[in-house]
């Protein structure tokens, strides 16, 4: 009972701490300059920031603080991906800010369809977590609609490719992705979760709008 109560209190505290998405960007960049610099990005992420490959993320509408944080992580090696690292190495801090503000301002991906057989399980995990293993609810950091928390650099998840999201959860669980830093929040959560839960969650957030 004590463990359950502590879990519920922790989730409630995280939920209260989550800030609403702000209309004005928290990053000092130029969307106009970013548009001119985004030509290379379009090869993988699409001209409008919506990727045709489900293993490459949609970045349209993603918060600028999160995008900058990930570009810096690719550049300094704290997040590994040969293709992205080679691109990030060529970017200055201002380049990153400009690109992030540009993509943040684009309309997010159109609502995708979640697997009807997985919606129930995915929604339960997203909104309620998993008490037995003390896995916090995704809603606490990523918000009711999956819009994320720009100030805390928690990404928007709504409309993201299910295949990409599931892969990131697997990578966090294995430790291959460690860009959650010293908090280890995503590695800890993913490490307590199963493959079935990854798939259900990923499908559910793909269908959020």
Where are these regions (language model features)?
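Gram-negative bacterial Sec-dependent N-terminal signal peptides
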Residues: 1-22
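Stable alpha-helical elements in mature extracytoplasmic
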Residues: 30, 37, 63, 70, ...
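Axial heme c-ligation environment in periplasmic c-type cytochrome domains
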Residues: 52-58, 74-114, 150-156, 174-208
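Surface-exposed interaction/gating patches
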Residues: 110, 117-159
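The feature marks the first
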Residues: 26-77
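Sequence context surrounding c-type heme c attachment/ligation sites in exported
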Residues: 35-39, 64, 68, 129-139, ...
């Amino acid at each position: 009972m004590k463990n359950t109560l502590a879990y519920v209190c922790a989730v409630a505290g995280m939920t209260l701490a989550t800030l609403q998405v702000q209309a004005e960007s928290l990053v000092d960049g130029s969307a106009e300059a970013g548009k001119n610099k985004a030509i290379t990005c379009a090869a993988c992420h699409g001209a409008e920031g919506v990727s045709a490959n489900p293993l490459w993320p949609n970045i349209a509408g993603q918060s600028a603080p999160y995008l900058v944080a990930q570009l810096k992580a690719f550049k300094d090696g704290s997040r590994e991906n040969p293709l992205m690292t080679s691109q990030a190495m060529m970017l200055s801090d201002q380049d990153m800010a400009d690109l992030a503000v540009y993509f943040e301002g684009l309309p997010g991906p159109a609502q995708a369809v979640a697997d009807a057989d997985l919606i129930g399980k995915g929604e339960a995990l997203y909104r309620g977590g998993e008490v037995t293993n003390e896995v916090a609810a995704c809603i606490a950091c990523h918000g009711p609609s999956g819009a994320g928390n720009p100030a805390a650099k928690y990404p928007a998840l709504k409309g993201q490719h299910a295949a990409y999201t599931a892969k990131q959860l697997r990578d966090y669980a294995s430790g291959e992705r460690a860009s959650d830093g010293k908090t280890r929040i995503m590695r800890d959560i993913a490490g307590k979760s199963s493959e079935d839960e990854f798939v259900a969650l990923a499908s559910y957030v793909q269908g959020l709008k």
